[in-house]
Structure formats: C-alpha cells, structure tokens
From Swiss-Prot:
Transit peptide: 1-24
Activation and inhibition: Enzyme activity is enhanced by acetylation.
Annotated organism of origin: Felis catus (Cat)
Gene designation per UniProt: MDH2
Glycosylated sites: S33
Example GO BP: malate metabolic process
Protein name, UniProt field: Malate dehydrogenase, mitochondrial
Complex and partners: Homodimer.
The entry's keywords: Acetylation, Glycoprotein, Mitochondrion, NAD, Oxidoreductase, Phosphoprotein, Transit peptide, Tricarboxylic acid cycle
Modified residues (N6-acetyllysine): K78, K91, K165, K185, K215, K239, K296, K301, K307, K314, K324, K328, K329, K335
Amino acid sequence: MLSALARPAGAALRRSFSTSAQNNAKVAVLGASGGIGQPLSLLLKNSPLVSRLTLYDIAHTPGVAADLSHIETRAAVKGYLGPEQLPDCLKGCDVVVIPAGVPRKPGMTRDDLFNTNASIVATLTAACAQHCPEAMICIISNPVNSTIPITAEVFKKHGVYNPNKIFGVTTLDIVRANTFIAELKGLDPARVNVPVIGGHAGKTIIPLISQCTPKVDLPQDQLTAVTGRIQEAGTEVVKAKAGAGSATLSMAYAGARFVFSLVDAINGKEGVVECSFVKSQETDCPYFSTPLLLGKKGIEKNLGIGKISPFEEKMIAEALPELKASIKKGEEFVKNMK
C-alpha cells in the first residue's frame, strides 16, 4: 500500500520512502488530529528523512501520537495538546506544516473559511515566530491566498520575517494537473509535470499546460475543460464527500511531497523545484505562485512564469484582481488584530 503511495508525482516523495535516504529533519504538524493532519503525519512518520515528528492540536493528539509511534520507522513521535504545550512542540523545528482549521462543506468556497481559519493561522504562526523563527513554514490552511499574507504580517510584527521561508502549499494543484493530463493523454502520471501558478482558489489556479513535460497538444475545448476541472477539483471532492469533508488524503500526499522536497533542498540536494504561493515580484501582485528553486535557506531562486500561451496570459489577467483582494483581506486582518 505504502509503496503505491510513494510512486507517483515527485522524485522527492519516492526518495523519502527509500531506506538509503538519511537525514535528521525535525518536523512539526499543527492540526495533526484533523482530516489532513493524520494522513500527513503518517506519511511523514514513514519517511527516513524525518528524525523527529512533533504533533500539535487542541484535541486527540496524544492518541494520534501513540498510534503513529508504534510504526517501525526512525522518526520519534510526540504529541502536544493545547496552547500551553505548543511552545515545546515547536522548539528546534526545521519545518512546520500547518493544516489546522475547518474544512469546506458543500456550497462553501475556500474564502468562506476565512473568518475561522484566519485567527487559527494567526495564533499558530505567532507561536512559530516566537519559538522557531528560523523554521520553514508551510501553510496548508485555506484560504491560502489570504493565510500566507497573514503569516507574513505576523512574522513582520515579531521582527523575524524572512520571505524565503514562508510557503503556501499549492502542490495539490500540480498533483491534480499531472493526474488529469495523464488521464486525458494516456500517460503515466508519475512522468507528467504541469507547473501551476497564481493562487490556490478557483480561477486564481492557473495550470501552464503549454509548459507541460512531456509536451501535450490539446484542442481548445479540451484545454478549457481540463483547466476548469483543475481549478474546481477541490469542489469536486467536497461534493463527492457530500458534507463529510474536503480533500484530505490527496492534500496530505501533496503536503508530504512538498515537505520532502524542502527537506531534500535543506540537505543540499541541487535542482529541487516546486511551485508554491510566496512573496513575489513576478507580477504586480505581492504574492504569487511560480516554480521555485529550493535551497538550504528556503527559496534559492524564483524561476518565474516563463513563456506562456495567450490563453494562459488571459487567465493571469483575470485572476489578479481576485488574488489582490484576497491578499489585502489577509493583510488587513493582521493590522486590525488587537
């Protein structure tokens, strides 16, 4: 089962399950008892790249930690429960992954989650700024288009802001794009790579199918349809789960893939590239997802948008107003915090 999980999308994920991989990454998962947090913690526990795994939530973490601790892999697991234990969970961490928050229900957009998740992310990232200011911060909590600006503003307030270490995890958009294009063209999804830029909600998700490797040719009707499916794939899962949650397993997989790529880069591996929603100067939007070359200190180089088609140019132009509004909403939230 786990070998099948390890197979697709991303050499980093495959390597993380190999016994030859050696590392001592200390990783914390905040929101570890939730629908994404539990399978994400399982994937992290299963990787030899991780030597210490600390799990935090406001309920059930001792049980999740006890369960995971019985797995015969090298990562030492410890659970932390409630705000008073959060500092100990974070001390010494190299990477912090935050999937905490409420999931979407049918009829909700990612933006509908803002009121609840904004304060959760602000609280957790404030603790990160205080107790592990040098760690890489990976935000999964939606709406990512707003929670990344929130994280940045919180770190600025604490005087420890480093834009090269704060990542909005958009990897699921890439995973979905790879899968859907592979299905459409009869390809092995493990060998397909579609960069996805922009943001992480609806029309701000911009798959660059013109840059797909291997190169694929699609008629405009298929291109429009598959682009729409990639943009609304999260809603597809929310509807299919019929009120029982949102994408959890695929999101955990994508989150683990991003963390393993980051750890590979921290270890000095060269040529590690992932897309992520970060502080950016690629457009007139202050945050934007593009392919990033990762390194020991986080973002080594923003690889930018590259050559794109007129269809993709149009999508960027249409996405920017919504993206700017979501970013401003996040920034204003922190400014108005007491």
